[in-house]
Amino acid sequence: MSFFCDSYPIIDKKALGEGIYSYTLKCPEVAENAHIGQFVQIKAEGYMLRRPISICSVDKENGTMMLVFEVRGKGTDKISELNKGDLMDVIAPLGNGFTVPAKKDGRVIVVGGGIGTPPLLDIAKMYGDRCTAILGFRSFDKVILDKDYSLAGANVIVCTDDGSTGVHGTIAQPLADELAKGDVAAVYACGPTPMLKAVVAAAKQAGVYSEVSLEQRMGCGVGACVVCACTVIRDGEEKVLRVCKDGPVFSGEEVVL
């Protein structure tokens, strides 16, 4: 695993919603080496532990990386004080990402739940109109990146728990409907564990390969502290792996959710 530890200039910052921000960094070496589904560890000034944030998108040609995160505590609140022109101290890219085939046969479905929506964007950019993006949120004011997915050419289905926009309810029925259409090569998902369970179950029932990116508390981010353990069934045996180093992406056939 090749990663870099450095401070990179912030060239853009946007507020996507209440407490949700996107940052674009100029970091050519990270952009060149990053894979879809990997993450970074960001240093929050005054705090010992870094905060893990998924990579939303990279532009290898321009040497940039976009990160999207939600303020969920004092650490991410401190990071959100950084502005355009400041330096962001990151370790990146980390972990193992999605195994997205270069040969793009068939369709793919990406399923994002809330702040699990960002790490799937580059899959939509790769597949364009052969990607269906099912994005679930609590309400209209929590919806993010739906326009970015549309600009990538994806067929976008937004779901909200309260019905304030898009499909009223969870991602379950839209996912079942899309799988029933057939010609689906894979399903990729990131979001809350109950959603991931539903995605894996639906994909298995349809006989479609799936991968999920786990949301997990982390310490070191490089596999040393074993804070972020998860269980998989591999070769008929139960094994404990580290989300940060062995993941955060795992096959739906293996991971125990």
Model-identified regions with their sequence ranges:
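Structural signal for conserved beta-strand scaffold positions within catalytic alpha/beta enzyme cores
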Residues: 12, 57, 158-160, 212, ...
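FNR/FR-type flavoprotein reductase catalytic core
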Residues: 74-215
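Short, basic/aromatic-enriched C-terminal tail that caps enzymatic domains
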Residues: 1-4, 240-257
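Ferredoxin-reductase
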Residues: 2-84
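Local cysteine-cluster metal-coordination motifs and their immediate loop/turn environment
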Residues: 119, 193, 216-248
